[in-house]
Amino acid sequence: MTKHGKRIRGILKSYDFSKSYSLQEAIDILKQCPPVRFDQTVDVSIKLGIDPKKSDQQIRGSVSLPHGTGKTLKILVFAAGEKAKEALDAGADFVGSDDLVEKIRGGWVDCDVAVATPDMMREVGKLGKVLGPRNLMPTPKAGTVTMDVTKTIAELRKGKIEFKADRAGVCNAGVGKLSFDGHLLKENIETLCSALIKAKPPAAKGQYLVSFTVSSTMGPGISVDTRELMAS
């Protein structure tokens, strides 16, 4: 067994993974795991008490994490004319209209988030089979269909993320880097939880935050007590 493997085993033996921990305890466990050669992303996986097959129980939105994600985003903007110039001036990495639509239709996709002005959505909508599975399709709910491209790009750079429940009713999101101070990660996660709670569909009944797991790229998944999160 490698030295790394022995150390992580020793750390994890101290914890009972059949129980749920407080959010701060879960973050502390991840931070005690041996380092790797890159700054790991901290992810959360949240099982929601919804029926995503029902149109009135689908969840999608966006939230600005107070301490950002630690990730440098590649931002693509579908826009023409003055709005295209505005997007370039605001620091978008890729800007175009029909030419960009054709490029993506040809198989090119090299961005982390896509933004579009409303007038472009007729053409962008045709890219559903390419952008949809990658969670890159601009939507009004996520704030990525907008005329204010400058503001949207600035928000994305500062840490605005999209959240969405998948077909199993699970929301997955990156909430920062393991190098972040623990209290910064905690505040980011609490901000996301607050946004999810506010987005709870009226039709959803029973327990809303069913389960909550926090993990790092190379670390274990730690179960977090959802009662604390509902109260935060």
Curated annotation (Swiss-Prot):
GO terms for biological process: regulation of translation; translation. The keyword Electron transport does not apply. It comes from the Bacteria. GO terms for cellular component: large ribosomal subunit. Keywords: Repressor, Ribonucleoprotein, Ribosomal protein, RNA-binding, rRNA-binding, Translation regulation, tRNA-binding. GO terms for molecular function: rRNA binding; structural constituent of ribosome; tRNA binding. Signal peptide: none annotated. Part of the 50S ribosomal subunit. Binds directly to 23S rRNA. The L1 stalk is quite mobile in the ribosome, and is involved in E site tRNA release. Protein L1 is also a translational repressor protein, it controls the translation of the L11 operon by binding to its mRNA. HAMAP family: Ribosomal_uL1_B. This is Large ribosomal subunit protein uL1. It comes from Chlamydia abortus (strain DSM 27085 / S26/3) (Chlamydophila abortus).
